[in-house]
Amino acid sequence: MRSHCISKKIAHGGRINAAQVLFPNAPAPWIDLSTGVNPCAYPIPEIVPQAWSRLPDDEAFSSIEDAARIRYNAPLQTRVVAGAGVQSFIQILPRIFPRRRVGILGFTYAEYALTWGASDSVVEIVDTIEQLDKDFDVGIIVNPNNPDGRLVEKGQIAKLAERFAQRNQQLIIDESFIDFYPQFSAVNLTLLDSVIVLRSFGKTYGLPGLRLGFALCSKHNENLLRQALGPWAVSGPALAIGLKALSDPEWINLAAVQCQQDAGRLDELLKDRKSTRLNSSHIPLS
């Protein structure tokens, strides 16, 4: 177990322009392997002019939130809150649950330690899920993990969530990369006040610039999240494109097969270069 607090800006992947400045003589075109974004993006549909010229209304939000609940196979009573990407929720969660002891299952996406540390919370990075089962006020699991793909079994998370509920603790589960492996998802736990599940839109659909993500939670947590986000938390064009994509099961099924095939091909290419596999991307699709 390690105490951890980050106070500096984090350098994320996907910064092709910065890389080109550092390595101006590198061969082109660049192949960006620095992010977990699907390189085969959902085709942008035609957007009605009103999506640009008007503020998004309540119906636009309720439509996409209903579509997300269905797409993620969440319980009917689960509340869904749309935001400008999962990062928007990461930024506000320390304000909703302030000055807490926060346990993070590491090594993982560093923005969690950064944002909670900046809120004067005491942050500890733990090495196993069992170490989260103690007197933390907030526990955070990224599942599958970013960046190494580590997966925590659904049953382990369910047991931990039950104990968090008994102790009135908060468990945050970031499922930004779980779309192709729904059998590992904890969305069935979102009726508990002690659980918030975060889901990314842009990564799987290859549209991170759209800035769209969702929190799945209980009614109590929905009220807290909406109050913290404020009105019009997502743009009209993002709501329109997201609704179209989430309502297109054929595309997501084909994308899952394509990504699995591409992952296998990449593994073979790297194996030919005598590279070492740190984690397997070959999990049977559900």
Locations of the language-model features?
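N-terminal "arm"/small-domain region of PLP-dependent enzymes with the aminotransferase-like
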Residues: 1-60, 67
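A general structural signal for well-ordered alpha-helical segments in protein cores
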Residues: 16, 30, 61-65, 157, ...
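Residue-level marker for buried hydrophobic side chains located in beta-strands
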Residues: 33, 171-172
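Short, solvent-exposed loop/turn segments at secondary-structure junctions
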Residues: 36-40, 87, 145-147, 178, ...
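Short glycine-rich, flexible loops that bind phosphorylated cofactors or substrates
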Residues: 45, 111, 147-149, 205, ...
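Conserved core of the PLP fold type I
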Residues: 53-165, 172, 177-196
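PLP-dependent aminotransferase class I/II
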Residues: 194-271, 275
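Single conserved hydrophobic/aromatic residue that forms the stacking wall/gate
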Residues: 272, 278-286
